[in-house]
Amino acid sequence: MTTVYVPAPDGTPLATDLCLPDTPGPHPAVVIRTPYGRTAHRAELRGWAAHGFAALAQDVRGRHGSPGPWHPYRDHEESDGAATVAWVREQAWSGGGPVVAVGSSYAAHCALVTALGPPGDGRPDAVIAAVPALGLADTAREPAGPERLSARAGWWAAHGDRPDSAPDALARALADDPRLLEHLPVTRLPDRLGRALPSWPGLWDACPRGRIVRRGSASRLPLLAVGGTHDPFAEDTLALWRGWGGPARLLLGPWGHRLTADRPAIASDRVNLGALYVRWARAALAGRLDPERRGVITLDGSGRWHGVGERVADGPSTRTTTWPFDAPTGLRLLHGAEFTADPARPVRSDDLAVPDGTTPADRCLLLSPPLPRPLDLAGPATARFHAAADTPAADWAVRVTALDPAGRAEPLAFGIVRRTDPPGETAEITVPLGTLGRRLPAGTRLRTEIAGHHFPAHARNPHTGENPVTATRLAPSRRAVSARGSALHLTVVARRRYVEPVPEICR
């Protein structure tokens, strides 16, 4: 393992760890560009090198060993990445050979923008993007607008406007002030953290979403998109895979943002991602991947994987089931057909407990009968209901929880949208709940909550029409949900198409 300094286009030396195979070259290469510290990837580099790849991990500009200003998601990631790939091809151990851009989270953004750059020696030959944090706007907000407060506060406190990282910065601040994220306005958070974060306010002005997904439609490079059904960026992973113009493969496992670092309970749900990446990279560089889109999605809780084609929910292997509100076979209203969404007392994202119905309703609560048999879910979920709010702006948050026969609760699906319907007028509200990959055992009941907030995961809508990140005044919002014509829609496996994930992805 050696450390070299790769010159960026403006001459900035980018600190890069390099690990070469023991065998004579030339070697194909793997490039990882990360803001989280290149030294954390040394075991990964050795793994690639053991399989015949020259492996590089680089600190992005302004982070750890690389000097310069640190501006997340700016255009320099593309140009610095291209300069690094071109430098790799100039080395004797490369011989101008193929390069794979690899990355997880922000590093996936770096890999993708490098892969989507102009043709030439600076563009890699394939890309592996895991749990991709695609861009500033993509990470800051949900597709329908609500701000991802706690996740962005945690990331910016840990990594923003500094050359190093303090992963527990937000946790320490919350220990000192448990109500830290409640203080208004949201843009003044750095004052309460006690350090300068000049880029924090601009985060919320970033637009538009989906830039990398749109650019990806013109690419002809092979793509491996890896995500988790519990990852907040799962839908971005799917959108990237669906829209990619070249041979595209999807692996959607039973994981969160840390992927297999959080070990699944069932051994057969586990995948050796390192071995998969090597096998896929070899197939991609050799031109052995079929041109069509292909992927696999977990059936979490079963140890099985379901094969998918052009779109997760297309084809005869799945169908949509409808769970009507207030129907014997659907979802029965427990309470809260009328409720008050009060941002001073918001429904919390970090608490699955629900009120017993003896207090004034702060959400609409529905419950299904027990499942008579196991149910495999593999595809998108949606809540569609008729409702009204008496305020000019309103967020609608829907949380679906699986209750086992003993009553233990486990999150199943979530979605939130922002609406500006005329006050008091009933409207049809559609809330996408993400893509599910799950086996529900017999006896499971589905509990559905419809609320006006999901705090602290999401910033509170003030209900005044003001921007939630600059607002300083909060107002309650009276809500009414109509059961008629309202339902939960789930994609279920109609015809089992079990596959082994690694062979399916590498062909």
Where in this protein do the model-derived segments appear?
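Short glycine-enriched nucleophile-adjacent loop
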Residues: A108-G120, L240
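Conserved alpha/beta-hydrolase
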Residues: A49-G65
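Short beta-strand/loop motif that positions the catalytic acidic residue
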Residues: S219, A225-G227
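Short beta-strand element of the alpha/beta-hydrolase
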Residues: P26-P35
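Accessory cap/linker subdomain of secreted extracellular hydrolases
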Residues: L116-A218
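Glycine/threonine-rich phosphate-binding loop and adjacent beta-strand/alpha-helix elements that clamp
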Residues: Y5, R288-R507
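Gly/Ser-rich "nucleophile elbow"/oxyanion-hole loop immediately N-terminal to the catalytic nucleophile
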Residues: T23-P24, P69-E77, A86-V100
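N-terminal cap/lid segment of alpha/beta-hydrolase-fold proteins
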Residues: M1-G25, L371
